[in-house]
Amino acid sequence: MEIKLFNKWDTTEIVVKDPSLRHYINLEPIFVPHTSGRNSGRMFEKAKMNIVERLVNNLMRAEQNTGQKQVTLSIVEEAFEIIEKRTNENPVKVLVEALENGGPREETTRISYGGIAFLQSVDVSPSRRLDTALRNIAIGTLNSAHKNKKSAAQCLADEIMFASKADMQRSFAVRKKEEKERVAQSAR
């Protein structure tokens, strides 16, 4: 028997193009992305968690969604159906492309030297890059769904599709990535 995500989408054929993110994007076959916090509390264990579950956990950020994992799972499943209908592609593949395009490659850190503080450009680790991309996709979804006629699933589908195309005008995640990289470039 073949294991598919939500019993609909196969994740075994998806290839992560970015070599740095390959070890952190987990696409192991799973029916329902819910591990009950099995991988929490230990360093780097989140890399073993399915990428869709990490997206669901990030979407449970808003006040009204806190702790409601089943509601958030249904939002993600509906968003994946919308993505599949619009693009005729595997929605998990589109999500992986969105994460590759939505994570910043360099950031700034504050360095204090002799009582003077200044910003220094640094490379971003793949784990932080993935965390930032997931966080920005979730925040962009929640911001666009707030006080809007569109459902959260439609807003999530739009955010993922625009981020996978690297559309800076319409994707919150790509816009934040470009902003961080621009600040880092000026701090070189």
From Swiss-Prot:
GO terms for biological process: translation. InterPro entries: Ribosomal_uS7 (IPR000235), Ribosomal_uS7_arc (IPR026018), Ribosomal_uS7_dom (IPR023798), Ribosomal_uS7_dom_sf (IPR036823), Ribosomal_uS7_euk/arc (IPR005716). GO terms for cellular component: small ribosomal subunit. It comes from Methanococcus aeolicus (strain ATCC BAA-1280 / DSM 17508 / OCM 812 / Nankai-3). CDD domains: uS7_Eukaryote. It holds the Pfam family Ribosomal_S7. Keywords: Ribonucleoprotein, Ribosomal protein, RNA-binding, rRNA-binding. One of its GO terms (molecular function) is structural constituent of ribosome. One of the primary rRNA binding proteins, it binds directly to 16S rRNA where it nucleates assembly of the head domain of the 30S subunit. Is located at the subunit interface close to the decoding center. This is Small ribosomal subunit protein uS7.
